[in-house]
Curated annotation (Swiss-Prot):
Biased composition annotated in UniProt, kind: Low complexity: 550-572
InterPro entries listed in its UniProt record: Rab3GAP1 (IPR045700), Rab3GAP1_C (IPR045698), Rab3GAP1_conserved (IPR026147)
Keyword Iron in annotation: no
Oligomer status and interactors: The Rab3 GTPase-activating complex is a heterodimer composed of rab3gap1 and rab3gap2. The Rab3 GTPase-activating complex interacts with DMXL2. Interacts with LMAN1.
Sequence ranges of Acidic residues compositional bias: 573-589
Protein name: Rab3 GTPase-activating protein catalytic subunit
Organism, as annotated: Danio rerio (Zebrafish)
Presence of the UniProt keyword Endoplasmic reticulum in the record: yes
Localization per Swiss-Prot or TrEMBL: Cytoplasm; Endoplasmic reticulum; Golgi apparatus, cis-Golgi network
Chain positions covered by the region annotation Disordered: 532-613
GO cellular component assignments: cis-Golgi network; endoplasmic reticulum
Length: 969
């Protein structure tokens, strides 16, 4: 009892009747969102202009809300307009209609071609939608629908929001909405009916008018006039009289070898199917009244030819198959493969190659054998490679080869047109390499994409690889062609044949790496060819000198063995050059330094031309510019490798010194050439010519008072341990032709050939992908120029810009490259659509009777490509309308199996019209009914009422907005 009497032990149960329920929390959350979006109070908007729903910008914002554990998405849709609040805020009336109610009666934006379905059905410019979340079930039961609508009504009343608020109910695919809009003393209810079949009594205008009148229940007599807008849509799918403009290339002829090699340089273009699948004609009768038009179950006045407004939209085929896009896609697929050439072509071929190449591995041992009976040229490495190459080719040309001989020969002839010339003239032929105009678009394009010039060998190779991959065997054909290409490169190197289609000079670092490698090989061939030509002339000079008893003939630049004196120079192989160089290098190493210097003093060598103004400071003899070695050309991978090596040397003094010595090879060579050309010269003479800024002149007064100009080295040249001073002291007077080569063309050529031989098909296609994209862009530009499509031009600029950024990366991402190819395919489809429409409307042919009609048709076709829906000038009586009418008549006759007679079509006989209607039954009918009546009582305010009706073969939809006066009800 004591415990019970303790006041602290007593417990009081408190019931909090203010606790909010889940329903109240949901309503509160809706109100918070409306406040966040500033949708509270009255809205002011500018009057809607005609077509603004289509041309204007629609924006939206969304948030997530919950009713207990059920997720909803609330979205605000609105047409972006300039604010009109400052202009009309002072003029607002206290009981003004909400903006949405005013939009119900606006006739400037009926049937917008591209808008939200609620905009089309109810004509509102701003609204809010509450819909179930992505993974939530639909609101189907009537109780849940009523609960949501009650929540909406309460939230609108509490906040004073005048923006209509909709709730999505039923299954999402049915697009069923119910909503409400509240204003001061007024309310509009948005209701909807959706059926699968059209009830027979409502399959015409008169039945729908009955529904509308019964729903609004106007007590006035007579009933205020009802504004009627009607749109019938007719679909054309059969293009009977229109020939498809795309002419596919004759691939059978190409396979049979009947098409010349030039065909390999052309990328295909165009759609394989008609990219225009349907044409939708909308015949519109705006702003009719009930007594003007008759449409019931017995008779209808609604003839599309008599409609005052026509508009057309085209439906395009989804992802049409296009030739260029298919080429690019199949080519890109090879980039993702990992097989080597041996794995693709099979081990048998590789084994045969290894068997035949055994001669190459024994080449060096054969060269060292003491046998004198074997001619020197039979023992050379190059001849071994050449003979093995011939045997490999013989083994490859079997019926199992991916490429047959005819196709392969056509490709090689296209790649190397100089091969068709007489063999005696091949080495003398220099292909005409036309450098692109620096102002041309092509020049800047290959610069941007890091590809290659469009007239180069690499460009042609990319096109051939692309074609054989698509038409002649896929990746196996690619591997086969690449092997043949590498063999051709080796043949040209061995035989001093310049590579056709490559610009002379060092590798162009603006191009792709493969193009640089081929340019490097061409440089090697040029150097080797020039050296061999120089030796040929030296040998003839040496022979003449020996006949005169001149001792200089026995030098390293002599003719060589006496038994070769009567031998043609063309019969010498590369092995003799290589062997001769080894001997000459050995003799040069044995040569005494002092003897060489004495000889250089007595006879200057390697002079190019006198300088003109400078003389040697000590001897006052003219200063001669020497013949120097050209610096070694390098590709970007070699430059990167060299920079990495130099960077690894570090920043220490020893590392810096070693780095300077590595970079001074060219300087030392130039010093030796300068000494040979200018006996008795000094370092000051060399610096004065080679680096004028390091030669400092100053005026000095001698003992006799005469002013002289004397020169000296700059301060940096006087630093102890200067690399220039060390190099000058070690440099010998040796002309460039007797120096050790800065650029070993034999070594570099073999490195390039080895690099090419190791390329997998996937690596090859990655190298050539910029060239293929470059060719595709040029092809699209060429095709677009004939069509004059501004949208395509702007798209091409964007594609070029994005592709250049991607391809500049050493390892571009495949996903981004796929996006570029997809964009090119989309542009190709646009051009194909333009050609299809021009063919259908007779723009390309000579069918148009008057020039002004042709111009109007061209503008009409261009608009169809750019806009979602295009108005037809003159409706059915204009130039475009006449063509559309003929298209439908032709389709109708074909559908009814009646032969088409052109004369009857032109005359349009009445009997024929009765038998065969010009248009099929409309695929869709849209009827819009509007009026303004007092509701619910005769003395209520006159408020807008609207009913939008959609009648299709498998759908019947009524979307109504019915307003009522709530002041006293």
């Amino acid at each position: 009892m004591a415990a019970d009497s303790d006041p602290e032990s007593e417990v009081f149960e408190i019931t909090d009747f203010t606790t909010a329920s889940e329903w109240e929390r949901f309503i509160s959350r809706v109100e918070e969102v409306l406040n966040d979006w500033k949708l509270i109070g009255s809205r002011v908007g500018k009057p809607l202009e005609k077509g603004e729903y289509t041309s204007g910008t629609w924006e939206e914002s969304s948030q997530e809300i919950s009713f207990a554990d059920f997720k909803f998405s609330i979205t605000h849709h609105y047409l972006k307009q300039e604010s009109a609040e400052n202009d009309g805020r002072d003029e607002l009336e206290e009981d003004a209609y909400p903006l949405a109610m005013q939009d119900l009666l606006c006739i400037n934006n009926d049937f917008p071609p591209r808008a939200h379905c609620l905009v089309r059905w109810f004509g509102v410019r701003e609204f809010v939608v509450i819909s179930p979340g992505a993974n939530c079930e639909a609101i189907i039961s009537e109780s849940k629908c009523s609960l949501l609508l009650s929540s909406v009504s309460i939230a609108l009343a509490n906040t004073g929001c005048q923006v209509p608020l909709f709730v999505q109910i039923q299954q999402k695919h049915r697009k069923m909405f119910s909503g409400e809009c509240q204003g001061p003393g007024v309310r509009s209810d948005f209701e909807m009916v959706h059926l699968r079949r059209v009830p027979s009594q409502y399959n015409h205008l008169s039945g729908l008018l009955d529904i509308f009148k019964n729903k609004i229940g106007c007590p006035l007599t007579p009933l205020p006039p009802i504004n009627i807008s009607i749109r019938f849509t007719y679909v054309l799918q059969d293009w009977q009289q229109c020939s498809w403009p795309q002419q596919p290339p004759d691939f059978d002829a190409l396979l049979a070898g009947e098409v010349g090699g030039v065909e390999f340089g052309k990328l295909p273009f165009g759609a394989c199917e008609d990219p225009i699948s349907e044409l939708h004609l909308a015949a519109t009768w705006p702003s009719l009244t009930e007594g003007i038009v008759v449409d019931n179950d017995v008779y209808s006045d609604l003839d599309p030819l008599q409609a005052p407004h026509w508009s057309v939209r085209v439906r395009t085929a989804e992802n049409p198959q296009c030739l260029l896009g298919e080429f690019l896609t199949e080519f890109f697929k090879i980039c993702c493969r990992k097989e080597t050439t041996e794995e693709i072509l099979g081990r048998s071929t590789a084994e045969e190659e290894g068997k035949e190449n055994s001669d190459i591995t024994q080449a060096l041992s054969k060269l060292t054998e003491p046998s004198t009976a074997v001619p020197i040229h039979k023992l050379s490495v190059s001849s071994m490679v050449h003979s093995a190459r011939k045997r490999i080719r013989r083994h490859r040309r079997v019926p199992e080869s991916p490429l047959n001989n005819d196709v392969l020969n056509s490709i090689l002839l296209y790649l190397f047109p100089d091969a068709a010339l007489d063999k005696a003239d091949v080495s003398e032929v220099r292909p005409p390499q036309q450098s692109p105009d620096r102002q041309s678009e092509d020049y800047h394009l290959y610069n941007q994409l890091k590809s290659c010039p469009s007239d180069s060998l690499t460009h042609r190779l990319a096109l051939c690889i692309c074609m054989v991959n698509f038409h002649h065997g896929g990746v196996r054909a690619v591997a086969h062609l690449w092997q043949e290409f590498v063999l051709e490169m080796r043949y040209r190197w061995e035989n001093n044949c310049l590579i056709y289609g490559l610009a002379s000079g060092p590798p162009d670092l603006r191009c792709c790496l493969l193009h640089q490698k081929l340019q490097m090989l061409n440089c090697c061939i040029e150097r080797k060819k020039a050296r061999d030509d120089g030796k040929k002339s030296s040998s003839s000079d040496g022979a003449r000198d020996r006949s005169r008893g001149a001792p200089e003939g026995a030098g390293p630049e002599g003719a060589g063995p006496a038994e070769a004196a009567g031998k043609s120079w063309d019969s010498w192989s590369d092995s003799e050059d290589e062997f001769f160089e080894c001997v000459s290098d050995t003799e040069e190493m044995k040569e005494d330094k002092e003897e060489a210097e004495n000889r250089s003093r007595s006879k200057p060598e390697g002079r190019l031309q006198p300088h003109g103004t400078h003389t040697l400071l000590n001897t006052q003899e003219p200063l001669y510019i020497p013949i120097t070695q050209e610096p070694a050309p390098m590709t970007e991978d070699l430059l990167e490798e060299q920079s990495e090596v130099l960077a690894k040397l570090g920043t220490s003094a020893e590392g810096a010194h070693l780095r300077a010595r590595m970079q001074s090879a060219c300087l030392l060579s130039d010093m030796e050439s300068f000494k040979a050309a200018n006996p008795g010269c000094t370092l000051l003479d060399f610096v004065r010519w080679y680096s004028p800024r390091d030669y400092v002149e100053e005026q000095v007064t001698d003992a006799d008072g005469r002013v002289e100009v004397r020169g000296e080295l700059s301060a940096r040249m006087k630093i102890p341990g200067n690399m220039w001073v060390e190099a000058w002291e070690t440099a010998r007077a040796t002309p460039a032709r007797r120096q050790k080569r800065l650029f070993d063309d034999t070594k570099e050529a073999e490195k390039v050939l080895h690099y090419l031989a190791l390329q997998k098909p996937s690596e090859l296609t990655r190298h050539l992908l910029p060239c293929v994209l470059h060719a595709a862009l040029l092809k699209i530009k060429e095709e677009e120029s004939a069509e004059d499509l501004p949208s395509v031009r702007s798209s091409l600029q964007q594609i070029s810009s994005s592709a250049s950024k991607i391809l500049r990366h050493p390892n571009p991402e495949f996903k981004k490259l796929e996006d570029v190819i997809s964009q090119l395919m989309a542009v190709e489809a646009v051009i194909a659509r333009a050609r299809s429409l021009k063919a259908k409307f007779g723009v390309c042919g000579g069918e148009r009777e008057r020039e002004e009609d042709g111009d109007e048709l061209e503008r009409f076709v261009s608009s169809l490509l750019e806009e979602p829906e295009v108005c037809v000038s003159g409706a059915g009586r204009g130039p475009a309308g006449n063509v559309i009418h003929k298209l439908f008549v032709s389709s109708q006759r074909a559908a009814l199996l009646a032969p088409m007679e052109e004369e009857t079509l032109r005359s349009g006989g009445s009997d024929d019209r009765k038998a065969f209607p010009d248009f099929p039954p409309p695929a869709g009918r849209e009827i819009l009914l509007r009026t303004c009546v007092p509701r619910p009582a005769p003395y209520s305010k006159a408020l807008p009422q609207r009913l939008f009706c959609v009648l299709m073969r498998d759908e019947f939809r009524l979307a109504g907005a019915f307003s009522s006066d709530t002041s006293f009800f």
